[in-house]
């Protein structure tokens, strides 16, 4: 990481956290909840872990690489426009559109290669997850960690 930056240059990690979480119990037992869990499981089986199990290590990796002035912020990205707050509602709407437009692509390789599903099984599951993503009664959100740090001005 450090070798590609000039001294004093910054590196930032940000990622969409899976599995998603909920501010209440409305996510429990849904296809949306299952989707996040299965995506992480499939990625792990393919040797490419993803989601919060990776993003929780960003700070540690930056420290190990010698970065300084490391900062961290955690955001909540709603799964759809369920929040009452105007800004969060708009963010949720854009997030919902993003997920719906990419859902099949996100799932197909991971679920067929990582979990051994047939394409038809993925299609059925994607339809269920899509319905949950549109359901404003499910108060889900994706953790969105952002971690950044600076390459030292001089070598340690």
Residue ranges and their predicted role:
Residues 10-101:
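Conserved catalytic/acceptor-binding region of the Class I
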Residues 65-156:
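C-terminal lobe and adjacent flexible extensions of AdoMet/dcAdoMet transferase-like proteins
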């Amino acid at each position: 990481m450090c070798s590609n930056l000039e001294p004093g240059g910054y590196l930032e990690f940000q990622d969409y956290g899976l599995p998603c979480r909920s501010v209440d119990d409305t996510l429990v037992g849904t296809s949306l909840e299952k989707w996040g869990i299965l995506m992480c499981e499939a990625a792990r089986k393919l040797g490419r872990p993803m989601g919060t199990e990776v993003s929780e290590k960003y700070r540690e990796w930056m420290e190990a690489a010698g970065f300084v002035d490391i900062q961290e912020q955690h955001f909540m990205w709603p799964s759809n426009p369920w929040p009452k707050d105007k800004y969060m509602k708009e963010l949720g709407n854009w997030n919902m559109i993003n997920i719906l437009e990419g859902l099949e692509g996100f799932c197909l390789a991971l679920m067929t290669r990582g979990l051994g599903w047939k394409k038809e099984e993925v299609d059925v599951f994607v339809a269920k997850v899509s319905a949950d993503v549109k359901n404003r009664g499910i108060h889900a959100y994706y953790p969105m960690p952002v971690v950044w740090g600076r390459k030292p001005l001089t070598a340690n």
